[in-house]
Each structure stands twice: as structure tokens, then as C-alpha cells.
């Protein structure tokens, strides 16, 4: 079922397609905030494709975490976000996350870590960038499989400050 929505103010139209809702015949759009892909579907996506998605997931979590942690100016929010999502910081978090991973999660992490990337930012080593890509690949796979609680658990545990023993 497809519907055409006309925006009279802008003079444009948008075509929306989805399944007809069984109760009222209305349009039921796919919810991209709540996906539940099967492992075989996720394995068909390249490691860098998963990392692309996971990069956005991780950044959204960092931004949410920063907004929740107190009042900061937009400039402070931006600088803090950049400091947490850069490859060296993600690599450090990946190192802290590794002991917490299941066998399947570790396989997804390694898939991303071992992916061949063509460009590495100047502020990161090859090893740091590979670890960051592994973290992003894992977060992308977990997000697409609908395992949001697990993403949150890993995120919270890796954002805690390390304890000096």
C-alpha cells in the first residue's frame, strides 16, 4: 500500500509505502528504531557497513549520556562528544569492553577490527582505528538485531571511569 502526501506550503509530494494496518487500513511504516534482523541478515552486511551504523549508535549514546550528565553549553557538548567518539577514545573503551563480550559478540568485534580500511585519521594509530572500527561494528550489529539493552549495558560499563587497584 502506498500513499502520496502533498505538502501544499512547499509544493512537493512524498510517497510513503508500507503494509496496510490490519485494524484500520492505515499505513504501518517500518520502525527503524526497533529492528530485529536475524544473524544471517546481519552477516550479509559488510563489517564497514555495520561500523557505519554503529558509529551513529555510539555517538547518539555519547550525546545522550552527556546531556543527561549535567548542564553544558553547546560548545562544551560538542567538544566532549568529539573527545569520546574519536578513535583513540573508542579504542580504549573497546579494550575495557572485550572481557565482557560473549563469543558471538567477540566475533562481530573482530570482524570489524580486521576489516580493511583505506584511510586512517591523523590523530589515531592503525591499531586504535581498527579497535574503534571493531567497537562500531559490534554496536551496529547489536542495534540492527534489536539488542538495545545489551548495547546500553556495554556502553554504561565502558563509560565508567576505570578504578585504580
Predicted features along the sequence, with ranges:
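Double-stranded RNA-binding/processing signature
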Residues: 2-165
Amino acid at each position: 500500500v502506498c500513499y502520496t502526501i502533498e505538502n501544499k506550503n512547499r509544493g512537493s509530494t512524498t510517497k510513503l509505502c508500507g503494509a496496510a494496518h490490519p485494524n484500520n487500513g492505515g499505513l504501518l511504516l517500518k520502525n527503524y528504531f526497533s529492528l530485529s534482523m536475524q544473524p544471517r541478515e546481519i552477516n550479509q552486511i559488510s563489517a564497514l557497513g555495520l561500523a557505519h551504523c554503529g558509529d551513529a549508535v555510539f555517538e547518539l549514546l555519547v550525546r545522550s549520556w552527556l546531556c543527561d550528565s549535567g548542564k553544558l553549553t553547546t560548545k562544551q557538548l560538542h567538544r566532549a562528544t568529539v573527545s569520546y567518539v574519536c578513535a583513540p577514545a573508542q579504542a580504549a573503551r573497546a579494550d575495557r569492553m572485550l572481557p565482557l563480550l560473549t563469543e558471538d559478540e567477540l566475533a562481530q568485534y573482530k570482524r570489524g577490527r580486521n576489516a580493511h580500511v583505506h584511510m586512517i585519521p591523523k590523530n589515531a594509530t592503525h591499531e586504535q582505528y581498527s579497535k574503534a572500527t571493531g567497537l562500531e561494528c559490534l554496536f551496529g550489529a547489536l542495534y540492527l538485531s534489536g539488542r538495545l539493552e545489551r548495547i546500553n549495558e556495554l556502553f554504561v560499563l565502558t563509560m565508567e571511569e576505570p578504578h585504580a587497584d
